[in-house]
Amino acid sequence: ATAALFIQLGANFVVGPLFNPEIAKICNRRLIPYTPGCGSVSEIGFAQETGCDLCKIFPAGNVGGPSFVKNIKAPMPWTLIMATGAVEPTEENLSAWFKAGVTCVGMGSKLFPKEAIAGNDWQSITDLCSDALSIIQKYRQV
């Protein structure tokens, strides 16, 4: 019901922490991309069968990290994966995820530190974002 409300309010996509087949149906009927959180190969396969093009691995660090992504991509190279949780805006971390085969990553508190927000330090956030994008451009395979 929440996804339908946000779609009615103009959402262009829906991202969730888990896979919900009912949300997949709502999004498919309205031609809205749905990126569910998946923690296993079975969840990814089921999400793909219901029309999800991009699957979010969440929490990526707890599910197996970059090696989990690499192991999924070997038998399922068509799988588009977004890693979230345990993703940091550093070259070591981002290069590991992109070398493993992620399509994209999601970052929250590591990219937008509470201290920077509380201190209105928008320049440090801008710098973190800029640095992260430069690293991603270096390693992302198009």
Language-model-detected regions and their locations in the chain:
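Glycine-enriched alpha-helix->loop->beta-strand junction motifs that scaffold or abut catalytic
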Residues: 8-14, 28-35, 49-54, 75-79, ...
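Glycine-rich phosphate-binding active-site loops on the catalytic face of alpha/beta enzymes
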Residues: 17-23, 56-65, 101-121
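Generic structural signal for well-ordered alpha-helices
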Residues: 3, 24, 44, 66-69, ...
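Catalytic cores of alpha/beta
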Residues: 1-9, 42-50, 87-105
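Catalytic beta/alpha-barrel core
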Residues: 1-4, 10-19, 33-45, 53-63
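C-terminal helical cap(s) of enzyme catalytic domains, especially alpha/beta-barrels
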Residues: 27-31, 98, 114-142
